[in-house]
Swiss-Prot record:
ATP binds at residues 10-15, 123, 132-133, 202. GO terms for cellular component: cytoplasm. Consists of three domains, a large central CORE domain and two small peripheral domains, NMPbind and LID, which undergo movements during catalysis. The LID domain closes over the site of phosphoryl transfer upon ATP binding. Assembling and dissambling the active center during each catalytic cycle provides an effective means to prevent ATP hydrolysis. It is found in: Cytoplasm. Residues 122-159 are annotated as: LID. Its EC number is 2.7.4.3. Pathway: Purine metabolism; AMP biosynthesis via salvage pathway; AMP from ADP: step 1/1. InterPro entries: Adenyl_kin_sub, Adenylat/UMP-CMP_kin, Adenylat_kinase_CS, Adenylate_kinase_lid-dom, P-loop_NTPase. GO terms for molecular function: adenylate kinase activity; ATP binding. It is an enzyme of class 2 (transferase). Monomer. This is Adenylate kinase. The gene is adk. It catalyses: AMP + ATP = 2 ADP.
Length: 216
C-alpha cells in the first residue's frame, strides 16, 4: 500500500504517519531523508544531487522523481510506503503520475487554520530537557516555568503565530491544490487512488481510527 498523507503543518500528520507505518509495516519516506541517503551512498544520482545542493540550487522535480523511483524499488518498500511531505506541488504530483509511480490511497487530514494556530502558538518548551507544554491543553503548574526545574519555558520561533500563519499561507497556495488534483484523479480512474477526507479535530485515538478505517 502506497499512501500520501496531506494536511497543513500542525494538522497532526506526523502522529498519524507513525500509526500508519506501524499498522501496515511500511517505511515512511521523506524527500529530505532520501536526499541525504543518496548523497551519502554516493550513487550516480547522489553525486548529481550533491552538485546541485553544493551550488545552493533547488533540486529539480525530475531529480526528486528519479530519487523516489530509486527509493521505492528497495526491498523495504515491497509492501508499500508512506510519502511524507511529498508531493508538495501539482508539477510534482503530475510528474509522479507520468513516471508511473502508482499511489493506492491519499488521506487528507483537514484542520481549520485557527485551530492550528491555537495548537502551535500555544506550545512552550523547556530547552534543556525537551519537555513540552501547551498554555491551553497542557499548562505548566507555574505560568512560563518548567514543572521540574522551575526554569523558563520558551516559545520556539517555528511556533510563533506569524510564522505559523506564513507556513499556512504557503500550504494553501502550494500544497492545498493537491487535494483537488487527487480528488479528480481518483474520480477519473475509478477510485484509484482511494481519496479520503478526515476531520483532524478530536482525540488522537478517534482520528487514528478514522485514518485506519479509510485505509482498510
Amino acid at each position: 500500500m502506497r499512501v500520501i498523507l496531506l494536511g497543513a503543518p500542525g494538522a497532526g500528520k506526523g502522529t498519524q504517519a507513525k500509526f500508519i507505518t506501524e499498522k501496515f509495516g511500511i517505511p515512511q519516506i521523506s524527500t529530505g531523508d532520501m536526499l541525504r541517503a543518496a548523497v551519502k551512498a554516493g550513487t550516480p544520482l547522489g553525486l548529481e544531487l550533491k552538485k546541485v545542493m553544493d551550488a545552493g540550487q533547488l533540486v529539480s522535480d525530475e531529480l526528486i522523481i528519479s530519487l523516489v523511483k530509486e527509493r521505492i524499488a528497495q526491498p523495504d518498500c515491497a509492501n508499500g510506503c508512506l510519502f511524507d511531505g511529498f508531493p508538495r506541488t501539482i508539477p510534482q504530483a503530475e510528474a509522479m503520475v507520468a513516471a508511473g509511480v502508482d499511489i493506492d490511497a491519499v488521506v487528507e487530514i483537514a484542520v481549520d487554520d485557527e485551530e492550528i494556530v491555537g495548537r502551535m502558538a500555544g506550545r512552550r518548551v523547556h530547552l534543556a530537557s525537551g519537555r513540552t507544554y501547551h498554555i491551553q491543553y497542557n499548562p505548566p503548574k507555574v505560568e512560563g516555568k518548567d514543572d521540574e526545574t522551575g526554569e523558563d519555558l520558551i516559545q520556539r520561533d517555528d511556533d510563533k503565530e506569524e510564522t505559523v500563519r506564513h507556513r499556512l499561507s504557503v500550504y494553501h497556495s502550494q500544497t492545498k491544490p493537491l487535494v483537488d488534483f487527487y480528488q479528480k484523479l481518483s474520480a477519473a480512474n475509478g477510485g484509484k487512488p482511494k481519496y479520503s477526507h478526515i476531520e483532524g479535530v478530536g482525540s488522537v485515538e478517534a482520528i487514528t481510527a478514522k485514518v485506519l478505517a479509510a485505509l482498510s
